[in-house]
């Protein structure tokens, strides 16, 4: 089991979540028709697989990942591929389910996958990483943030880990004096949510605010939050921290409005996507804050070029998951070129070379400048704070 490496967050916090295969007809046909690129002239290609939810309650995440991965693969191939070899990419739906994610992994293995970019959400990612460890296959998850998701030595991530999200959130709330009394509503049956809560609670003691209510729910009780909200309201919570996914968060905001409770709401990367929830009154998310490494309205040239191309291709604004994924594919390219790997190498030999290369590269991407990785797979980069203003994500 890897040791968790702390991220250097303090400087950024002065300014400034998640993861089956279903090889259904729709998933397979999408992968076959839209997500495979032409092989190199000699027939040798790198085969990179992806896994995530493109149906179900977390589909906003998986769809963004699938889109951005293909964008990156198209760029890689247009620029000459990896070490002169073109890349084939195939994505499998896992519906944010661990068992289906393992099935998806097996489907991709049968296809000939040599490296895995995935999975998208934490619980499925943890299940799949146990399988990639058995096969010694290189794995880079864009967004699987649970500590356990990259426990094996072959697994790395682009996003922040859950513990670091919890610590960073508590620091931001405390340093910016957002509230004296804070409530937390979290999913005790989910490793992403409970992991963030635990380190948030620990760091809160150092930040000068009090957690006046810590209310849990489970996968079996995630449609009615009236009890948790009532306890937060009665405790006088001025801010409610929600280390959860956007679907449940949209229900909480709706129910809080119904009961006349109007605290500040604060989330992490799993909140990204709440403006796209079907039938949700997005005005209820006004002034909601979250920590994320990517803000689509940032004015730097790299972000604007990515957002413009993504909007043109998919008629949508990319979220953090899309940005993490675009970076992930280019990170794979950079590490593979550093390692000098070729498609004729075994999966295990590719993995061993990639593991070393990941600790030697420095990557400038959409989600961080001068990103580096330790041998335990953790990235060193810094988060940003984002607020929903006038129905749009806005950098703080």
What are these regions (language model features)?
Residues 17-34:
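Bacterial lipoprotein signal-peptidase II cleavage site
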Residues 40-42, 49-70, 92-98, 120-121, ...:
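Extracytoplasmic "Venus flytrap"
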Residues 155-216, 239:
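An alpha-beta-alpha
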Residues 199-291:
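Extracellular/periplasmic bilobed ligand-binding domains
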Residues 60-67, 82-149, 217-225, 250, ...:
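Beta-alpha junction/loop-to-helix N-cap segments that form part of ligand/metal-binding clefts
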Residues 253-326, 387-389, 393-394:
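Extracellular/periplasmic periplasmic-binding protein-like sensory domains
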Residues 101, 158-181, 194-196, 222-226, ...:
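Hydrophobic alpha-helical segments within soluble ligand-binding/sensing domains
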Residues 313-319, 333-395:
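Segments of small-molecule ligand-sensing domains
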């Amino acid at each position: 089991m890897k040791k968790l490496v702390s991220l250097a967050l303090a400087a950024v916090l002065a300014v400034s979540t998640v993861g089956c295969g279903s090889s259904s007809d729709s998933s397979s046909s999408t992968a076959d028709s839209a997500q495979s690129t032409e092989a190199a002239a000699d027939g040798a290609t790198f085969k990179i697989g992806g896994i995530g939810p493109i149906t179900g309650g977390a589909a906003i995440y998986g769809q963004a990942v699938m889109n951005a991965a293909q964008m990156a693969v198209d760029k890689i191939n247009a620029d000459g591929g990896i070490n002169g070899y073109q890349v084939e990419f195939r994505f499998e739906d896992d519906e944010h389910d661990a068992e289906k994610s393992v099935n998806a992994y097996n489907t991709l293995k049968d296809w000939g996958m040599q490296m895995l970019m995935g999975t998208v959400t934490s619980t499925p990612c943890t299940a799949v990483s146990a399988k990639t460890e058995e096969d010694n296959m290189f794995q880079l998850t864009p967004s699987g943030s649970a500590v356990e998701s990259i426990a094996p030595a072959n697994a790395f991530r682009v996003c922040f880990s859950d513990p670091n999200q919890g610590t960073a959130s508590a620091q931001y709330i405390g340093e910016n004096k957002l509230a004296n009394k804070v409530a937390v509503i979290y999913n005790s049956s989910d490793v992403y949510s409970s992991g963030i809560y635990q380190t948030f609670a620990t760091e809160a003691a150092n930040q000068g605010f009090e957690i006046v209510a810590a209310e849990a729910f489970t996968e079996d009780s995630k449609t009615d939050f009236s009890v948790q909200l009532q306890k937060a309201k009665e405790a006088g919570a001025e801010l409610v921290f929600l280390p959860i996914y956007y679907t449940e968060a949209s229900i909480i905001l709706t129910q809080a409005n119904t009961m006349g409770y109007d605290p500040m709401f604060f989330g992490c990367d799993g909140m990204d996507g709440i403006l796209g929830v079907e039938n949700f009154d997005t005005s209820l998310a006004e002034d909601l804050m979250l920590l994320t490494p990517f803000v689509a309205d940032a004015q730097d040239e790299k972000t604007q070029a990515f957002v413009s191309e993504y909007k043109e291709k998919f008629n949508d604004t990319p979220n953090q998951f899309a940005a993490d994924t675009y970076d992930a594919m280019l990170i794979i390219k950079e590490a593979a070129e550093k390692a000098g790997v070729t498609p004729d190498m075994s999966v295990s030999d590719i993995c061993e070379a990639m593991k070393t290369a990941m600790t030697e590269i420095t990557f400038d991407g959409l989600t961080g400048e001068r990103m580096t990785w330790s041998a335990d797979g953790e990235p060193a980069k810094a988060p940003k704070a984002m607020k929903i203003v006038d129905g749009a994500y806005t950098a703080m």
